[in-house]
Amino acid sequence: MLKQVGDGVWVRQSGWVWSNSTVVRTDDGLVLVDPGISGAELGALADEVDRLGVPVVAGFSTHPHFDHLLWHSRFGDVPRYATAGCARVATEGREQAQVMAVETAEDVPVELVALVSPLPAGGGPVPGEIIEHDGHAVGHAAVLLADHGVLLVGDMLSDVLIPMLDVGRPGQLDAYEAALGRLEEAVRRVDVVVPGHGAVAERAEVAARLTADRAYLEALRRREEPVDVRMEQDWMMGPHQRNLQALLD
């Protein structure tokens, strides 16, 4: 079910890794950010979007991981955007993203996965300010909707996921820490932060998430075992081990 988190901003959470789809109302229509995950959930999101009575005019993907590159035909044949870096990686890795989507979620419209284009100068129909960084993935974007009091941060600042480095690329600790610094500045301009996975946070709650993420990264840098409540989930050990391996490669 869509939950309003700001003026003209709604979030729907998936049962898969607490993934958040965001709907933003603009003067021209609705923009969907990272809609997902299963075919049934995408269809339910389409039902709720229909009830808003406003047409979808665009989509936006915050980064080039499969669960942020999904779409449904009922949203319409409208432009779907990403940063130039994200669009390039998504296009090059489209086949792999399709495979991962099929293996992970039921009835995903595979033919619509990863069909994103570089965002035009000025943002086109996508509202707000795009904050691009290289933490977590190439061309990762946060969307600062200052007029709505909301910041969409993609796969950052989660209460359920540890920081996940972009394995295979050098300098990821520095890149992730720099990204956190930029997001910290943006948080001061909003009331609500929407992560790609996990609970929507009020501004006062975000400081604890920033502290937790920085403590985790510092433990990695020191080659120490992090003390992080998020790692009490057994399945978080896989991402943690990949982070460790990334620092050794």
PLM regions: where:
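Accessory terminal helices/loops
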Residues: E184-V192, A199-D249
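Generic beta-sheet signal
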Residues: Y81-T83, V153-G154
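Short, active-site-adjacent cap segments at secondary-structure transitions
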Residues: D67-H68, R88, V200-E202
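Active-site metal-binding motif and surrounding structural segment of the metallo-beta-lactamase
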Residues: A40-A82
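Short amphipathic alpha-helical segments
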Residues: A46, W71-R74, G93-E95, L165, ...
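Conserved beta-strand hairpin/beta-sheet module of binuclear metal-dependent hydrolase folds
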Residues: M1-D47, R51, A142-G154
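Metallo-beta-lactamase
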Residues: Q4, L30-V31, I37-G39, R51, R88-D134, V138-R209, ...
